[in-house]
Amino acid sequence: MTGLFITLEGPEGAGKSTNRDYLAAQLRAQGVQVLLTREPGGTPLAERVRELLLAPSDEAMSADTELLLVFAARAQHLAEVIRPALARGEVVLCDRFTDATYAYQGGGRGLSHQRIAALEQFVQGDLRPDLTLVFDLPVEIGLSRAAARGRLDRFEQEGRAFFDAVRSTYLERARAEPARYRLVDAAQTLADVQACLDTLLPQLLELQRG
């Protein structure tokens, strides 16, 4: 039995983690085996890389270094967590995956999408998410929510232009491959967002049984 790989994407303050947990609870209530994970991170080694990527520092990190660290963490995450869970037939719900790399390192940092695609193929082979939920909201709302959480990480400290590019890249990717992506209006109340997820649940269950 092959599992199902679902990723949750979106900019800062979009509520991905909260809604990932909600979706997991709904799937588990239907008897589905669910594994929750996140990127960067998901394993002890990858979590240490996450700390390098997110911690504010006086030493500037080059965009290429950032990109390579992201894919190094992803390689470990795939080998240790994601591929084994899919092989067991589980549903993997991952907070961010390679779409975030295209959005943040491609859109935000301005790195070539061809360079990202080459690393994607090297690290992932043919593995791609079965479904990606993009939690979209205006940049100013997302940044306001992120600021309300407290101390900002290295990415959250970026300026408005960076996050405009991140959001645009997510939306471009969703438009280019509508069969894989579902857009969720994350500017709504949490109750309304979760009502939207409830409408997607039958489709997720069908894919899982598929």
Curated annotation (Swiss-Prot):
<keyword id="KW-0547">Nucleotide-binding</keyword>
<protein>
    <recommendedName>
        <fullName>Thymidylate kinase</fullName>
        <ecNumber>2.7.4.9</ecNumber>
    </recommendedName>
</protein>
<comment type="function">
    <text>Phosphorylation of dTMP to form dTDP in both de novo and salvage pathways of dTTP synthesis.</text>
</comment>
<comment type="similarity">
    <text>Belongs to the thymidylate kinase family.</text>
</comment>
<dbReference type="GO" id="GO:0006233">
    <property type="term" value="P:dTDP biosynthetic process"/>
</dbReference>
<dbReference type="Pfam" id="PF02223">
    <property type="entry name" value="Thymidylate_kin"/>
</dbReference>
<dbReference type="InterPro" id="IPR027417">
    <property type="entry name" value="P-loop_NTPase"/>
</dbReference>
<dbReference type="InterPro" id="IPR018094">
    <property type="entry name" value="Thymidylate_kinase"/>
</dbReference>
<dbReference type="InterPro" id="IPR039430">
    <property type="entry name" value="Thymidylate_kin-like_dom"/>
</dbReference>
<dbReference type="GO" id="GO:0005829">
    <property type="term" value="C:cytosol"/>
</dbReference>
<keyword id="KW-0067">ATP-binding</keyword>
<dbReference type="GO" id="GO:0006227">
    <property type="term" value="P:dUDP biosynthetic process"/>
</dbReference>
<dbReference type="GO" id="GO:0004798">
    <property type="term" value="F:dTMP kinase activity"/>
</dbReference>
<dbReference type="GO" id="GO:0006235">
    <property type="term" value="P:dTTP biosynthetic process"/>
</dbReference>
<dbReference type="GO" id="GO:0005524">
    <property type="term" value="F:ATP binding"/>
</dbReference>
<keyword id="KW-0418">Kinase</keyword>
<keyword id="KW-0545">Nucleotide biosynthesis</keyword>
<feature type="binding site">
    <location>
        <begin position="10"/>
        <end position="17"/>
    </location>
    <ligand>
        <name>ATP</name>
    </ligand>
</feature>
<keyword id="KW-0808">Transferase</keyword>
